[in-house]
């Protein structure tokens, strides 16, 4: 059973996050291992396994990039374990330049420039994210997979920039 079915939700990217949260709580109550403490060893093991599956499904569906990757996996694109990389050389060059810029910001300890950089990367991420949503809605799986690969780069860059921000603020 796929994670969307487990949560009683349609297999699409855009979800009702409130329904997801409520269903998670219901499933957790229903399959909590403590409810099966007096059951047989097989029942206890099944409850632990079901609880682990529910937790994994919850983690996957509540995080946008993980949800997109999972949805794509249901359509034959296993992005989590693939060796396929981004082949868009212009995008890769842009990423290298952004990484170099982030390194320069770190060396200069330039908080104002870092703030501007973070905003710019967030805007780039948001633009690509919107494109991915449209591609997934239109079932353009190949294009969506390529966009998700690019979003991973941007997500890592954003995370690195935010970590640098924390580091600079701690000085």
From Swiss-Prot:
Gene3D superfamilies: DnaJ domain, HscB, C-terminal domain. GO terms for molecular function: ATPase activator activity; protein-folding chaperone binding. GO terms for cellular component: iron-sulfur cluster transfer complex. Keywords: Chaperone. The keyword Chaperone applies. The keyword Cell inner membrane does not apply. Interacts with HscA and stimulates its ATPase activity. Interacts with IscU. This is Co-chaperone protein HscB. It comes from Escherichia coli O139:H28 (strain E24377A / ETEC).
């Amino acid at each position: 059973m796929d994670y969307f079915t487990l949560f009683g939700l349609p297999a699409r990217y855009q979800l009702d996050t409130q329904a997801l949260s409520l269903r998670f709580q219901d499933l957790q109550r229903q399959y909590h291992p403590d409810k099966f403490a007096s059951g047989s060893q097989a029942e206890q093991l099944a409850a632990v396994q079901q609880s682990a599956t529910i937790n994994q499904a919850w983690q996957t569906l509540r995080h946008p990039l993980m949800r997109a990757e999972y949805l794509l996996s249901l359509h034959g694109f296993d992005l989590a374990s693939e060796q396929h990389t981004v082949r868009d050389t212009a995008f890769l060059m842009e990423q290298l330049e952004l990484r170099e810029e982030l390194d320069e910001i770190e060396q200069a300890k330039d908080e104002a420039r870092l703030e501007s950089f973070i905003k710019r990367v967030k805007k780039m991420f948001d633009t690509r994210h919107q494109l991915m949503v449209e591609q997934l809605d239109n079932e353009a799986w190949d294009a969506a997979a390529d966009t998700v690969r690019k979003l991973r780069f941007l997500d890592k860059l954003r995370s690195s920039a935010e970590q640098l921000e924390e580091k600079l603020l701690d000085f």
